[in-house]
Every structure is written in structure tokens, then in C-alpha cells.
Amino acid sequence: MADSFAKGVYDIVAQIPKGNVASYGQIAKMLGKPRGAREVGWAMRHCPEGLPWQRVVMADGSITGGEYSEIRKALLEEEEVPFLTDGRVDMKTCQWSE
């Protein structure tokens, strides 16, 4: 993946407002790569410090991140992001639209 793609990912993620989330696929589409969700995931695994990484979730609102998933959920709860009863983010309520 080119560094310019990763920079584009980081630029978009930095714009997601507190209390909102975006999906990996949504970010990929914004960058003109509608099938680039995995590339967005790769970029997010290497994101710079200070980027609100917790605001990027799966399209269905599932939280990823292995051992970091509980940290991600806690950070989103602090931002008052709503969750469904099954533990997924309520994408209908808080999905960011640029």
C-alpha cells in the first residue's frame, strides 16, 4: 500500500467528530477504493499516536481489535457512542457522514 493511501486514511479519521464512527469500507470509498476496507484496516494498525482510532469500526458496527476491543469500546462509551444490545455500535444513530 502506498504511503499516500495511508495518509489519506489518517486525514479522514482525524475529521471524524467525537461521538461518531465510520466504517473501514466507508473510509475506503471516500478515498476512491470501494473495495479497500482491508487496506484501511492495515493503515489503522499502523496509525500515528493521537489519531482517534477507536472511531473506525466494521460496517455492521462490530468492534475489532483483539485485545484492544475492550479499550475501543470504553473509549467510544466515553464519547457517548450508542451501542445495540448485542454490543455493536448503533450505526444508524452515529455513523459519520462527511
Model-derived regions: residue spans:
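Nucleic acid-binding interface residues in structured DNA/RNA-binding domains
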Residues: M1-E98
